[in-house]
Regions:
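Conserved, single-site charged/polar hotspot
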Residues: 1-321
Length: 321
């Protein structure tokens, strides 16, 4: 487990049922962070892909995928394993590998936005599938971003991803997410790209995330949001739900929380009446406690999409039983 001072690390562990009485020991070695290990530098690409480059396979709109298929090696390595990773988990893993969780909030947000836009460009352009490969992205820093199997995730990075996971970076008149390349800025220099250490120093000086991004990528860069998130039953209503809120979105939330409560019985069930009262707030609070969200009883952006994610998960499990 990789830890930093004063930062909470979250280590995912998969428990498997053993068919024998004998215990087994199968350690997983987590690879080193990109800022202290020497990995191959990124091979430069155009930040906006042409149709000819992508093999003429391009999505009609920007979509947050349910799953990223990560090829655990160079694109041409046929022995590399392909891992199927939920989109947000992929972004959290890459960010935990590429930047330090101890950095200022603005630098974390700027880097995470660049990581997401980089990833969604690969998704939107079908970059590797257009070249005959059956995956979304690689784990090689020479071609893409560093993803490490079973990497420790840091709580503040996880929170920021939850808050802005539907965003990406755009330029006027360009549909595709900008392919925002970056480097560390110390061992490797990269003109017109963001440098990770440089973003940290700019945040120390008080610059915001968008100011940092424009410093490196130019004044025309702006933050955009997707309209479609794959696998999510209904989009965020555009405002927080709290005591006094009413309507179909509240009813949908109540129904989903009640379904989740079947698998997590410490969550109290509530009347699905479309009225956000104290009982609904209590159920949301318990949900937030279980899934490591800020415990407010208010259904904000992060809570809404976490409820949707868990709801989809438990209903899929039930279908497969």
């Amino acid at each position: 487990v990789q830890m930093f001072t004063d930062e909470k690390g979250i280590q995912s562990v998969k428990l498997r049922v053993s068919d024998t009485d004998q215990s087994s020991y199968n350690p997983t070695v987590i690879g080193a962070h990109t800022l202290w290990e020497e990995y191959p530098p990124k091979i430069a690409e155009d930040e906006i892909k042409t149709v000819a480059e992508t093999g003429e396979i391009v999505l009609s709109r920007v979509v947050i995928p349910e799953t990223i298929v990560v090829h655990y090696g160079a694109p041409s390595d046929p022995t590399a394993i392909d891992y199927y990773v939920p989109y947000k988990d992929y972004i959290k893993n890459v960010a935990s590998n590429e930047i330090y969780s101890t950095w200022p909030d603005a630098s974390l947000r700027a880097n995470i936005l660049a990581i997401m836009s980089f990833t969604l460009n690969r998704v939107y352009t079908e970059w590797y599938r257009g070249k005959g490969y059956d995956f979304t992205i690689t784990s090689s820093t020479a071609y893409d971003q560093k993803w490490i199997y079973n990497k420790t995730i840091y709580k503040n990075i996880s929170r920021i991803v939850d808050e802005q996971f539907a965003n990406y970076l755009s330029r006027p008149g360009v549909t595709q997410p900008i392919f925002t390349q970056y480097c560390d800025g110390k061992r490797v220099t990269c003109p017109n790209w963001m440098t990770q250490w440089g973003s940290k120093h700019l945040a120390d000086q008080g610059l915001s995330a968008i100011e940092i991004l424009r410093y490196y990528y130019g004044d025309s860069i702006y933050i955009n949001s997707v309209e479609t998130i794959a696998g999510i039953p209904s989009s965020y209503p555009g405002y927080d739900l709290s005591i006094g809120a009413t309507g179909d979105k509240v009813r949908q939330l109540q129904e989903q929380v009640n379904r989740i409560a079947q698998n997590y019985p410490s969550i109290p069930t509530v009347a699905a009446d479309g009225i956000y009262g104290p009982a609904t707030a209590d159920a949301v609070r318990r949900f937030q406690q279980i899934f490591d969200l800020p415990v407010t009883g208010i259904t904000d952006y992060s809570t809404w999409y976490k409820v949707s994610q868990i709801y989809v998960g438990v209903t899929k499990i039930a279908e497969n039983i």
